[in-house]
Amino acid sequence: MHARAGIIATSLVGLVALAGALAGCSGDANAAGGQDKTELVFATPPGTDDPNEQAIFKDLATMVGEASGRTVSNLQPADYLGVVEAVRNGSVDVAVLSQFSAALAYKTDSVDPLLVWGASTEPASFCLARKDSGIQSAADVKGKQVAFIDPGSTTGYFMPKSMFTKAGLVDGTDYKSTFAGSHDSAVLAMANGNVDVACTARQLYPTFIQKGVIKEDDVTIIAKSDPIPVGISIVVRKDLDNEAREALKAKLPAMLAGNAEIAKTLGISGEPVKDPEFSTYAPLVDVAESIGVDLDDLR
């Protein structure tokens, strides 16, 4: 589930500046502290410029408002870890977090997870190459350049990089990598020959074909990652009032499940776990460690 086309890859150093900008947008969010607020600021991860996807996120924000009984404004920070920082510093009250962003946020005590859905059985990521490149499998990536999405992206970084690691390939030694900043940008860079391979979310692949971003006859799916061991999370700032928390837990799951487009976009099915323990996210920590990433280092 993801920065917009054309955005240059955001370094982790830039998170502080992003957090400051968000704080300015949210007015006195920090001053409100644990006090009840009549308006909630809701954030979603970066996605694509697809108007349909943007409309789905607006519908999601509306549901958060209906479930909580509050007025809701919506933000979409430019990178995945920016969402974590915005919740941590009080600029955002409620957010959807991708799997590794949620694990990071929980591990660093930055947010309170309210809801987390179960794992999918589908591959998380597809890695693509031009058909005329001669790249047919993960093993062929040796000596090539790969476009990942963002340091906090589950489908655009952690899962595909883990796949290459399992294939015996070490980033920086066996292949070079770059962060494209968005799924669109990574796929376009591959299609235009600027990189050899682009790794993106499985569910975005048919969208890119339908929208004409790439032609199916021109690309090869060279590898598919494992499924993500944990689903998407809804999190809140740590001092959000109990009334809003309980209302969201009670009402939001059924509302999301009842909207087929939202459920598909977020990859949710079944009943979520409410107030999950950190052990729920432990499989994600294992994946991060397998590729040499300590989630604490991403703060």
Feature-to-residue mapping (PLM):
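An extracytoplasmic/periplasmic, membrane-proximal ligand-sensing/linker region
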Residues: 36-43, 48-65, 229-230, 235-236, ...
